[in-house]
């Protein structure tokens, strides 16, 4: 389509911080009250060559962090398809992980427990018989991915708020222990 990538050429236009604290009651669940309390950093970016804007929103909770990309309404970015996302998650060690193979068509697998460095060697054996399978990489896993560090800290990588956006798998660079987001394509390959 001739449009410049949204991967580079951005400058920071503005940053702002805020805090939020509320308690809400779910209709159903184990807890009567749920506290939603976080500190937030909003980074507003402008791509200098195109004049397009993108925001990065980070939220820090007592028990986790989250981030998302936002595309404010703008004349020069009305309709677009995100085919790839290159978010990376660098692990601090060869953690124990509970994972299933990254597959576009099914999540019907038993979980495997292994070190991150062992995923490549175990993945093919973790693929059980199923009529509809599309494993995308020898080191690809599905989210949510649960891990435990040698110090006993639990880590969970997952996506949230998927509105008009593809679900995320993770592809592991097993030499450097870095996961990169890997989006599930739609029916026509976007």
Where do the protein language model's features map onto the residues?
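N-terminal accessory beta-strand-rich subdomains and adjacent acidic, glycine-rich linkers
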Residues: 1-190
């Amino acid at each position: 389509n001739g449009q410049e990538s949204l991967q580079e050429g951005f400058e920071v236009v503005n940053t702002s911080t805020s805090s939020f604290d509320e308690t809400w009651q779910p209709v159903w669940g184990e807890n009567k009250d749920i506290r939603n309390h976080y500190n937030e950093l909003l980074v507003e970016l402008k791509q200098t060559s195109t004049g397009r804007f993108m925001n990065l929103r980070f939220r820090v909770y007592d028990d986790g962090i989250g981030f998302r990309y936002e595309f404010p309404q703008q004349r020069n970015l009305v309709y677009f398809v995100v085919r790839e996302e290159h978010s990376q998650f660098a692990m601090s060690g060869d953690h124990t992980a509970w994972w299933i193979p990254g597959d576009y068509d099914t999540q019907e697998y038993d979980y495997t427990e292994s070190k991150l460095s062992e995923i490549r060697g175990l993945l093919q054996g973790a693929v059980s018989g199923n009529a509809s399978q599309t494993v995308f990489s020898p080191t690809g896993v599905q989210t949510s991915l649960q891990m435990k560090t040698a110090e006993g800290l639990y880590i969970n990588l997952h996506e949230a708020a998927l509105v008009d956006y593809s679900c995320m798998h993770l592809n592991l660079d097993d030499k450097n222990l870095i996961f990169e987001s890997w989006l599930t394509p739609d029916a026509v390959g976007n």
